[in-house]
Curated annotation (Swiss-Prot):
Involved in the transfer of Cu(2+) ions to the apo form of o-aminophenol oxidase GriF in the grixazone biosynthetic pathway. Keywords: Copper, Signal. Residues 34-45 have a biased composition (Low complexity). PROSITE patterns: TAT (PS51318). Disruption phenotype: Cells lacking griE and griF show accumulation of the 3-amino-4-hydroxybenzaldehyde (3,4-AHBAL) intermediate. It comes from Streptomyces griseus subsp. griseus (strain JCM 4626 / CBS 651.72 / NBRC 13350 / KCC S-0626 / ISP 5235). The keyword Lyase does not apply. Residues 32-51 are annotated as: Disordered. The keyword ATP-binding does not apply. One of its GO terms (biological process) is melanin biosynthetic process. Predicted to be exported by the Tat system. The position of the signal peptide cleavage has not been experimentally proven. This is Copper chaperone GriE. It holds the Pfam family MelC1.
């Protein structure tokens, strides 16, 4: 029996919704729980402790403010600016605010896509955390 247009649209929509609902189940459940787990060390970096981790094969270090602060990717400094509302902006992601320096560094690693972080050429800003 041939399907009319309405039945075809309903079947296609139903299949698309079912596929979208299955994505969290098939991807290991990386949703809000994974974001909360990733935020735990990030919250610690905002409280004066140094944090070091490997992210996507890169080394990220957020130095403690007592040690001069700063964010480093593979030992190279990442220019980070802190705003009054406790948001951070990096030179790699200039249009996206991050809640912590660690989140800004992770986003910069994603933007680098394996390339080496180049030093800042303008030299007019100092990284303050």
């Amino acid at each position: 029996m041939p399907m009319n247009r309405r039945e075809m649209v309903m079947a296609t929509t139903g299949a698309a919704l079912a596929a979208a609902a299955a994505v969290p189940l098939l991807s290991g459940g990386e949703g809000e729980g994974a974001a909360e787990a990733a935020a735990a060390p990030a919250k610690a970096t905002g409280r004066g402790r140094e944090h070091t981790e490997r992210y996507l094969g890169r080394s990220i270090r957020v130095a403690a403010p007592a040690d001069g602060g700063g964010v480093f990717i593979d030992g190279r400094p990442l220019h980070i600016m802190k705003f009054a509302d406790d948001a951070y902006l990096s030179s790699m992601c200039h249009y996206e605010m991050a809640p912590t320096p660690l989140h800004a560094a992770r986003r910069a690693v994603e933007e680098l896509r394996g390339a080496a972080l180049q030093p800042s050429t303008h030299g007019t800003h100092v990284t303050h955390l």
